[in-house]
Amino acid sequence: MNSPLIRDYMPELDVVRGIAVLLVLFLHGMALPLQGELSTFGRVLYDLSQYGWVGVNLFFVLSGFLITGILLDSRHRPDYFRRFYIRRALRILPALYALLLILEITGLASSPFIAVSFLFLANFAGFLGITKGYGVLWSLAVEEHFYMLWPFIVRKCSLRKLLTLTIVIFLGSPFLRILLLVNPVPQHYASFYTWFNLDGLGLGALLAIWLRMPSFRRAQLARVALPAMLLGGVAFVMLAGHPWADVTLAKTACNLASAGFLSCTLLAGSSKWKAYVDWPIFKFFGFISYGLYLIHILAFHVASILLSHYLATPLTRNPLAAMLLHFCGGLVLATAIAYLSRRSLEERFLRIGYSSRRVELLRPSFV
C-alpha cells in the first residue's frame, strides 16, 4: 500500500540533495590544478564535469518544492511569519556566517564581497564591480530572495492563484533570459541575477501546490513524472553546449528534468519501490549537503595548493591523476568539515528550535 506523497519527513529527499551536491562538487573538483594534456578518457571526464551545474538547478527545484510546502502547510497559523523566518535563520545563518569569517581571515574573498554576501547580495557582486568572490554564494542569495518574498504571496493567495503564478514564473524567467541575448549585456548576468533563476524555484513551487490541490490524485503525477524527466533530459542534451541555449532554454529543460526526477523520487519513496531510492551514500551526502555546498570550494583550493607544492613534477606528467587526486582530496576534506559543521554547529542551532514552544521545526529534512 502506498504512503502519502507528502509526509512530515521524506527521507528520499536526502537522496535528491546528495545527488545535487555531488554534481556541484563534480563540477568544481575536476578543475585541473596543474598544466598538462589530458588523455581521451580524461578529456571526456572533464567535459562531463562542466555540466555539474545542473546540481544547482536541482537544488532550486527542491528548494521551491520544500519551502512552498512548508508555507502552505502552516499558513493558517498566527505565528506563520515568525515561525518561518526564525526557522530559516537557524538553518542558514550559523554555517554561512562561519564561512564568511573564514574567508575574511584567510583572504580568499575580498572584504567587499564578504559584506554583500552578509546581506545576501552576492549575486549582484559583478554589477557592483566587486571582484575576488566565492562562487557558490550567488545561488544562496537567489534562494534567500525567494524566501524573503514568497511567504507573503503564499499567505495571501488561493491555491489556484498560486498555481497560475508559478506557471507564469516558470515561463517568464527563461523569457527574460532570451531577451537578454538581444541586449549588449554580459551573459553572466543571466547566470547570477535572481529574476533569471526563478524558473526552477517556480517549478518546484508548482509541484508543491499541485500536490495539495483538492482535485489532485496520485495517478496524475505518476502519468507525467517520468515523461517530464525524459523530455527535459533529452531537450537538455540537445540544447547544452550551444552558447545561446546554455543561458536560456537549456536551464529550463534541466529544471523540467529535475522536477520530473523529484516527482519520480517522491512516488517511489512513498510506495513499495522505496528501496530503489534508499541509497545510504546519497542520504549521507544529503544530510551534510548544506555545509558541503558552502565549504567545498575552499577544500578544493587547499587540495590544489597541496598538490602543486608536493606533487607538481610527477603530476604534470599525468594530468588525469592530478585531476582525480584533486577531486578525491578535496571531497574527503570537504566531507569531513561539512560533517563536523552539521554535528557541532548547525545542529546546535537547530536544537534551539526543537526545544522552543514558539518555533516548531520538522525533523532534519531542511533545504
Positions of the model-derived regions?
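Alpha-helical transmembrane segments in multi-pass integral membrane proteins
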Residues: 1-12, 22-50, 67-79, 105, ...
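Residues within membrane-spanning alpha-helices of integral membrane proteins
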Residues: 14, 18-21, 56, 63, ...
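Hydrophobic, aromatic-rich transmembrane alpha-helices
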Residues: 100, 147-156, 160-161, 168
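Function-critical hydrophobic alpha-helical transmembrane segments in multi-pass membrane proteins
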Residues: 130-154
